[in-house]
Amino acid sequence: MAANTPHDPSSPGHVPVMRQRMVELVGIGVTAGSAPAQPIIVDGTLGAGGHTEAFLEAYPNAIVIGLDRDPNALAEARARLERFGQRFFSYQTRFDGIGEALEHFSEDPDFPVDIREQGISGFLFDLGVSSMQLDQEDRGFAYRVDAPLDMRMDPSSRLTAAEILNTYEHGELARILKRYGDEKFAGKIASAVIREREKQPFENSARLVDLLYATIPAAARRTGGHPAKRTFQALRIEVNAELESLELVIPAAFSWLRVDGAGVFMSYQSLEDKIVKQQLKGMTESSTPPGLPVELPGTEPEFELLTRGAEKASEQEIAENSRSAPVRVRAARRIGAHASGAGGPRYPLVSTH
């Protein structure tokens, strides 16, 4: 797809990953007996709007708020979802800005319900770079085409991949390649980058890809996929502060969830999945000290897991949509709430059973 070609949400590359399963998981709180008349769903990574469209079609009484930091994605999703009228609202923010977005709509007199009173009934965060961004060649996310080393999900943000390559010290560059890309040759690549940038600053992706081919040993290039994959992933995560955002958004999103509401995360690489797994584990376990024969009052978990381990796409879906192959899905629902305060839910979201 050319860089200036309008995005086609209906093309095969833009089929929402695990579409029906996301409808089922997010819908647990929407269809619960305690659900309000107009339940609210938050799509924290709106992208092209495929998952949001599925939610709006499946649950005719639901309202969906879509968040995205990319203004191009927001514009295309708004056009795609215009037919749903006042059932779809959008807001530009990094996904850990969910609280800011919900506060905004709480103050909006045109929003149909009181979010502070009602809370949200479900949310989805489909992490990583979107199919739309990968297919927009001038964004610099894809290593198979030559493009400016940008990689910003929000074009108004400052830091680019080129700036990282041209300004980071050796130790910091090696650290992000190792931590965010699990790159075994991080130190060697960092040395090569610093040596080459002294000749000429990095601007385009093809030069970086050539450097990686020249730096990574031939035996290592024959396994583990494209030799640029890990470095490009690491740069993208650093540019967009993806892991920091994820660590912040998990407690923030669950704090707005009403009783019986479900929260879902779709991860595409091990660092994301590890963060989600660890935080959900802590949220769904009792805080009673180990060794006591009974659970102490007030220490019972507020949430329970909806997935056993991490769910994956089916073999059939992977065959039809290769971008679903790495996905790992984890979900939890709120089963109780204690009084608002330190460490507690922001609002008294009590079931109406």
From Swiss-Prot:
Molecular function terms from GO: rRNA (cytosine-N4-)-methyltransferase activity
Location in the cell: Cytoplasm
Protein keywords: Cytoplasm, Methyltransferase, rRNA processing, S-adenosyl-L-methionine, Transferase
UniProt key word Metal-binding: no
A biological process term (GO) from this entry: rRNA base methylation
EC category name: transferase
Transferase in keyword set: yes
Gene Ontology CC entries for this record: cytoplasm
Xref: HAMAP family: 16SrRNA_methyltr_H (MF_01007)
Protein name: Ribosomal RNA small subunit methyltransferase H
The gene coding this protein: rsmH
